[in-house]
Amino acid sequence: MGPCNPTNIFLLCKDYEVDFEDLRLTCVFCKNELTTEELLAFALKELSIVWRHNWPFGVCAPCLAREVKVRELRHWDHSCYGPTVEQTTGRSLAELYIRCHACSKPLSIQEKEHQVQAYIHFHYIAGQWTGRCCQCRGPCTARWQP
């Protein structure tokens, strides 16, 4: 990566004077072009642009899902509850940058608190703490109530 290559999708658009709607990125794994939905998800998940031979790449949804699962299976270390994470790191959950281990979206403070209140484990995978975002937690059970 060069010293001035942007790693954020919005900085890429700004630096190269390209509208987000006109941006085209190729998946670093399968080399397919990202769809508009995948570009939006890439931006929402705050994923980093990868540079190969001075060319920017993103990641498509199927490849991201596969790579996240591979990372979890190969690099899972241990799991524990929120208070233990805080004791281990010496920092509050609010200060920690925690991503969803299923989709890679950064967790909001509310999602972190939900995990604590619902007694759901955080997972230490590849040297980073991960959890589950609200979209990956599972279906809403409220609609199943009589």
Swiss-Prot record:
Zinc finger map (unnamed): 27-63, 100-136
Protein name: Protein E6
Subcellular location: Host cytoplasm; Host nucleus
Chief location bin: host cell
The family this protein is said to belong to: Belongs to the papillomaviridae E6 protein family.
SS bond partners: none
Any Pfam family: E6
Domain of life, per lineage: Viruses
InterPro entries: E6, E6_sf
Keywords: Activator, DNA-binding, Early protein, Host cytoplasm, Host nucleus, Host-virus interaction, Inhibition of host innate immune response by virus, Metal-binding, Modulation of host cell apoptosis by virus, Transcription, Transcription regulation, Viral immunoevasion, Zinc, Zinc-finger
One GO cellular component term noted in the UniProt record for this chain: host cell nucleus
GO molecular function: DNA binding; zinc ion binding
Function, in words: Plays a major role in the induction and maintenance of cellular transformation. E6 associates with host UBE3A/E6-AP ubiquitin-protein ligase and modulates its activity. Sequesters tumor suppressor TP53 in the host cytoplasm and modulates its activity by interacting with host EP300 that results in the reduction of TP53 acetylation and activation. In turn, apoptosis induced by DNA damage is inhibited. E6 also protects host keratinocytes from apoptosis by mediating the degradation of host BAK1. May also inhibit host immune response.
Miscellaneous field: Belongs to the low risk human alphapapillomavirus family. The cancer-causing human papillomavirus E6 protein has a unique carboxy terminal PDZ domain containing substrate but low risk E6s do not possess this domain.
Gene Ontology biological-process entries: DNA-templated transcription; regulation of DNA-templated transcription; symbiont-mediated perturbation of host apoptosis; symbiont-mediated perturbation of host ubiquitin-like protein modification; symbiont-mediated suppression of host innate immune response; symbiont-mediated suppression of host type I interferon-mediated signaling pathway
Gene transcribed to yield this protein: E6
Originating organism: Human papillomavirus type 61
Subunit note: Forms homodimers. Interacts with ubiquitin-protein ligase UBE3A/E6-AP; this interaction stimulates UBE3A ubiquitin activity. Interacts with host TP53 and EP300; this interaction inhibits TP53 activity.
